[in-house]
A protein has these predicted regions:
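Extracytoplasmic/lumenal domain signature
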Residues: 1-214
């Protein structure tokens, strides 16, 4: 916290409790969070916005946004079945108007939970519960893209929720895409297809980079 090397480790356990440890491995005094409603299957996230720390985690249906002591920082009333492969990511509005965390449910609906307490949902298509989702600026235009890898389908939508490009693999990749930035506008996305023993590298327009797959 506060760049003073006062590190904390937050561990979600099967007993539905979140344990807070210091860097020596001792339980932290003053940690007040009691328990979640169901088991947490993803790591606890730490985000810092301005001078405030946000600990964000989700159980099967509920999202929790806490302060560093385990108190509720933002109350959320939205319940949805969380996708097991996708954790929360932080999104800061370009105009500085606010922040939100973003994730998907088991059908691929995108849920924005704003730090103001409001929520927003975007449905682009219907996906399986094992999809991968990322929310990134893929082409350097300072606008975010919705990126889905579901089975053997790769689909990328722009900020206006229009399909930018798609690609169908012969076999289904089993790991999430990896993103590379070589310059402000030169950004690429890599996908490993283990069953084909091939690596795919996509330009930000959806075309395969020269020489790929390899």
């Amino acid at each position: 916290y506060d760049n003073n090397r006062d590190y904390r480790l937050f561990i979600a356990c099967e007993d539905k409790k979140i344990y807070a440890y210091d860097k020596e491995g001792s339980l932290v005094n003053g940690w007040s969070f009691e328990n979640t409603e169901s088991e947490v299957s993803q790591p606890v996230n730490h985000f810092r916005v301005g001078d405030k720390d946000f600990l964000v985690l989700g159980d099967r249906f509920r999202t929790y946004i806490l302060d560093r002591k385990g108190n509720t920082r933002i109350s959320t009333e939205t319940y949805f079945p969380h996708s097991f492969r996708n954790n929360y990511s932080l999104h800061l509005q370009e105009d500085g108007s606010g922040a939100s965390v973003v994730t998907t449910d088991t059908t691929g609906k995108v849920h924005f939970i704003l730090f103001s307490g409001n929520t927003r949902t975007v449905e682009l298509d219907r996906f399986t519960g094992s999809h991968f989702f990322d929310y990134k600026d893929l082409n350097g235009d300072r606008k975010m893209e919705y990126i889905f890898l579901d089975g053997n389908r790769l689909l990328v939508y722009n900020s206006d929720e229009k399909l930018l490009f798609s690609y169908t693999f012969k076999e289904s990749p089993h790991t999430r895409p990896v993103f590379y930035q070589f310059s402000a506008s030169d950004r690429k996305m890599g996908v490993v297809c283990g069953e084909e023993n091939l690596i795919y590298l996509f330009n930000n327009d959806g075309k395969l980079y020269e020489g790929f797959p390899l």
